[in-house]
């Protein structure tokens, strides 16, 4: 733990976990700002999203990775490759485990990926412990201690210990990212694992995302929320043109949503344009909370068949 006069620590912490383990919720919670889109639909994070946390003289650059999912489809293989490439370079590997689910093939694959680093730079956090017990109104420390004991003794905890037998016990935590319970202890240990180094980014910075990326992601988030049952993974978003107007007080943006079939386009547009109009208004409201501009946004819907099989499209979307 950093004390007065200690050298600053700075580094990159990669957040890894199976789809819907709460990685984006955790990132937004520790950053204090919306950095990554959140959806109940698995694998909505497609890029390595960076969120920056400054605590005293320390700086943690979090990287929220796509949910790790074993699949032979080209799209999912590219997501897996993205995670693998980032694991090697990170200073700390934060493994978020959904405490409500059993150990399965995806957890086994993640443990195999992290096993070479378990002694030195892996942290494990059982997330969603609030779901296991509906109330956290009792003393927080007692609640987390009790839940941690139950999880470690259960089948999930035993399987994780067997897969990562050399992970130190003091680097295993129980948290609720949604309710921000147990995060302080986790963050203290994470800071201790960072190398002594100067900050990588200015102290007032909380993400390195471009405005175009944030616009694209928020549009996609609203589209997924409106059409979650029909086409969550069949769409992508993009910005065609963007500029600051009216003395840099207005952000004008022409964007698009692309789907794979005409029938999906009809769902996204809706009767008399009702769905795409609602997506546009929701995106504008979300952008106004994040950006210091008046937002002028136009969204069109187009069909882009087989985009998930084209290398150049995947390269532009997954990075």
Swiss-Prot record:
Domain KH type-2: 227-303
Sequence positions that bind GTP: 17-24, 64-68, 127-130
Domain Era-type G intervals: 9-196
Statement: the UniProt record of this protein carries the keyword Cytoplasm: yes
Superkingdom as given in the UniProt entry: Bacteria
Region (G5): 175-177
Protein name (Swiss-Prot/TrEMBL): GTPase Era
Gene name of the record: era
């Amino acid at each position: 733990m950093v004390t007065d006069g200690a050298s600053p620590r700075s580094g990159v912490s990669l957040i890894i976990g199976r789809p819907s383990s709460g990685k984006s919720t955790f990132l937004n919670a520790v950053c204090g700002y919306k950095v990554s889109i959140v959806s109940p639909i698995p694998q909505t994070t497609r890029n390595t999203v960076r969120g920056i946390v400054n605590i005293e003289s320390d700086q943690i650059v979090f990287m929220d990775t796509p949910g790790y999912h074993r699949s032979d489809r080209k799209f999912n293989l590219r997501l897996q490759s993205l995670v693998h490439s980032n694991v090697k370079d990170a200073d700390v590997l934060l493994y978020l485990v959904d405490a409500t689910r059993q150990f399965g093939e995806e957890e086994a694959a993640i443990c195999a990926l992290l096993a070479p680093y378990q002694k030195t730079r892996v942290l494990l956090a059982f997330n969603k412990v609030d779901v296991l017990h509906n109330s956290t109104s009792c003393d927080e420390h007692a609640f987390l201690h009790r839940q941690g004991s139950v999880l470690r003794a259960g089948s999930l905890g035993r399987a994780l210990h067997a897969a990562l037998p050399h992970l130190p016990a003091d680097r295993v935590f129980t948290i609720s990212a949604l309710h921000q319970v147990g995060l302080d202890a986790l963050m203290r240990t994470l800071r201790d694992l960072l190398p002594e180094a100067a900050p990588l980014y200015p102290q007032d910075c909380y993400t390195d995302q471009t405005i175009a990326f944030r616009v694209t992601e928020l549009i996609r988030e609203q589209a997924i929320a409106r059409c979650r049952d029909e086409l969550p993974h069949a769409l992508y978003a993009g910005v065609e043109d963007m500029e600051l107007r009216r003395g840099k007080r207005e952000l004008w943006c022409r964007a698009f949503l692309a789907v794979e079939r005409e029938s999906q386009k009809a769902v996204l547009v809706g009767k008399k344009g009702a769905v795409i109009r609602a997506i546009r208004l929701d995106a504008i409201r979300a952008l106004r909370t994040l950006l210091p501009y008046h937002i002028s946004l136009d969204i069109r819907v187009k069909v882009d068949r087989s985009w998930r099989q084209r290398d150049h499209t995947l390269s532009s979307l997954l990075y």
